[in-house]
Curated annotation (Swiss-Prot):
Record Pfam families: Com_YlbF
Family (UniProt): Belongs to the UPF0342 family.
NCBIfam families reported in the protein's UniProt record: PRK13676.1-1 (NF010209)
Organism superkingdom: Bacteria
Name of the protein in its database record: UPF0342 protein SPD_1206
Amino acid sequence: MSNIYDSANELSRGLRGLPEYKAVKAAKDAIAADAEASKIFTEYLAFQEEIQKLAQTGQMPDASFQAKMEGFGKQIQGNSLLSEFFTKQQQLAIYLSDIEKIVFEPVSELLK
């Protein structure tokens, strides 16, 4: 039987070899090369972190967070580099979701 860590590392290498992964990486590199897109992206990630902290403490985002989220949505849709990145990221997420189901299937079986 192969070492489970070797299998995980092989999976990691396989993900990096996917065309969808490479497309996300190229889109992220394009964002990094554009000052406006990079600024919006960095601010968006910081905002996402704020929301995660709220969720971890059991707090709900208020109306100002909703307004800020809508603002980011408009900025992202209005920037072709950012909208391309998130589109490509969604395509990669399909693989990640499928892999998650496969990996957690044995754990799920234990809970039945």
